[in-house]
């Protein structure tokens, strides 16, 4: 017996049960599964019922920890059974209830459920007398229901099946509610009735900040607007002073639409904010323009913040107030839209093009106007009335409705959709930075006086936004070049353009910048005045043909239309600040830009797409323009 003292309990039991003499009784080794009183096998064999069901006790109770209780009865000792007949029975026992063995394995890893189990055994009125080792071990063969529920809950929260979003293959939905939810995200979008608090300028790229700083930026923006907007829930409690670095990241606040009840529409294409009273579109942020979304701190749990860019506010943090615990549902829906769009992008990158084109062609009135599908602009990015630096000519609210990518739909609210985290990042933005870019344009920036050199890397590299910011180099840069020449034909201006420098400051254009540009353009032979998109494309015959026109539907928006590789390209030339620029250079005027690229045989490149300027299409070749002049 002592030679086998080092063997495990399982090996010892199998040795005794299979090869021991029928007349020998072996004293079981002490185990922490047993009761405090070490009981011999002869005492255990004289015990009463085993378990709650009163099943007969096996002749060898030492096998109970390793075999199911209902199958642990061995043949009688009067008729010894050969070993070959026991092996199939043991195999069937092992395969009959493998969950029992897994439960025993969990108990062997130092859990604290055994004392609790013994306490429940002692309080169980169905048990007879003190709990024997067989009773406690047979009950441990099946894990207690509280433990199973706890483990099952954690597994559901961590497994990929718990996420309702489809994987790389075919979507696997667990309920009709999940299917209905995904259909809304892929189609018209999910609608929530929230309160718009305003937005705060973000002067640095979120990609230049680490994860912790991004969260601090959004929470500081929430705190600022809660203090500025009357009646905000988060303005009552005192908050800690902001971190010093936040003053260089956050800029001015725009409270034009603050406190307004809006309908928030979340889809895989965009986030749209619509005024519930007059159905006016406050903001329409394409999903590519959203980089970060987060909830508030413990004092502002009813708020959701997301960082997006648009031509009016440039990069800004928009704050939404969600009542009745809806904030978690809103942030979860945004995160699911991020993930679902990213998975669609991985399967088929061309879906971005189709999704963006659907936003423009919404109704029959879309054919009556020009669709602004410039390759450096996202469809539907027409800025609304107002904003921090809006110099555009104001548009009527009825015209703005044409840019709405949604239609009126019944407001819906999903109270049970709070499975995901409260902070989300747009993965599609990082994948485009690697090289899978979509030819849609140039990034904008409003104020660069506080802009650091580190965040200049992504300036005009994100193919999502109109080139709406005018940057001018500091005096003395670019070889002390002269200022813009307001008079004379710019075709004969041969000076080099100003190079965009890190730390450059923007000088606001005068209020007469747009009329002044229009006056200059009329002296150019390639300027055709107001011209629709289709009419401009009809004048482009061969590669290298280009012309300059004014948008027929957006006054003050000047477009360079060119033909490259048999495909028409449309590039916005003048930003709302009145500056003419490309990704790397600032030009005095449109003629200076054209002359520079023609003389140096340089194409205009934006987000992987280029337009070569070889031969201008003169206004004499436009019969419609000649007829209007007569």
UniProtKB/Swiss-Prot annotation:
Query: What are the start and end residues of every segment in region (Disordered)?
Result: 39-80, 118-150, 471-514
Which SMART domains does the annotation name?
Answer: PTB, SH2
Cite the record's Low complexity compositional bias ranges: 125-142
Q: Name one GO biological process term.
A: intracellular signal transduction
InterPro entries recorded for this chain?
CEP152/SHC-Transforming, PH-like_dom_sf, PID_Shc-like, PTB/PI_dom, SH2, SH2_dom_sf, SHC_SH2
What the protein does comes down to:
Activates both Ras-dependent and Ras-independent migratory pathways in melanomas. Contributes to the early phases of agrin-induced tyrosine phosphorylation of CHRNB1.
The protein's name in its UniProt record? SHC-transforming protein 4
Query: Which organism is the protein's source?
Result: Homo sapiens (Human)
UniProt lists the gene as SHC4
